[in-house]
C-alpha cells in the first residue's frame, strides 16, 4: 500500500498583470476544483499535509500569492488585497473558469472573500479561516488617527521595509526554532516543512524567507478603509468561518460581523490559534470535509 506522503503535486506557472506566478496542482483533473489560499508571509506548501488528504475527492490547486513562495515579486510593491484578486481570477481562467470550492486563511481568506463577493456565481462554497480583516474594535482604534496620519505612517513603514535588510539564518534548523518560538502550537514536522520549502540562500550565504519583505507594508487602499460589509452581503453561497479559541482574532459571532452574511456558520476550534488548520489539522479537516460535501 502506498504512503499518502508519497503523493506529490505538479509545479505550474501562469501569468497575471505582468507577473509570473506559481501554483501547485495536486491532480485528479475532472473532479470538482478546490482552491486553497495561504496566509501572509507563507507559501503554497504549507497546505501539503491537508492537500494530500483532500486530493482523492477534489482537484486541489494551491497558488503562491504574488510576492510569496515561488511566485514573482511585484516590482512596485503592489500587495494589497485588491491586487491579489485579479491573480486569482487569472488562475481560474488558466483552469478553464470552473465553479470552485474556495478555502482561504488570513490574507488568503480576505482575498477569497473579495473574489466570492465579486463573482458569486463562480464559488459553490467558501471556507474562511480568520480572514475577515479588522474587527470593529480594531477598526475603531485605527480610525482614532486621521486619514492623513494613517497615510503618513504607511509611507514611513513602506520606507522602513525598503531599507531594512531581511533577517538571515545560519541554518534551516535555526529558522525552525525561531518559527516554533513564534508559534509554539506548530508541530516540529510542519515547522520544518514550512521552512524547507519557504526559504532560500541569499547573497550572504544565509537562509532567508522567499517572500518579498514589502508584503509587510499593506497597500494604501486599506488606509482608513470602511468595514467591507457590502462584500459580505454580496456573497450568496454557504460560508464556513473558522476561528481558533486561543487566537488573537476577534470572534465574528461575538463582534457582530456574522449578521452581514446571508448563509454563514462559525466554528471555534479549541487549543488552536490563528493557524488553527496547522495546530489541529485532523479536527479542521473533519469540519472542512463535512462543509465541502454539504453534510455539515
Residue ranges and their predicted role:
Residues 17, 49, 61-107, 118-119, ...:
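Active-site loop/oxyanion-hole signature of alpha/beta-hydrolase fold enzymes
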Residues 24-73, 77, 257:
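Conserved HGGG/HGGXW glycine-rich cap/lid loop of the alpha/beta-hydrolase fold
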Residues 111-115:
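Hydrolases whose catalytic domains are alpha/beta-hydrolase-1, hotdog thioesterase
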Residues 117, 124-168:
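Flexible "cap/lid" loop of the alpha/beta hydrolase fold
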Residues 166-245:
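Alpha/beta-hydrolase
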Residues 229-272:
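Conserved loop-alpha-helix segment in the C-terminal half of the alpha/beta-hydrolase fold
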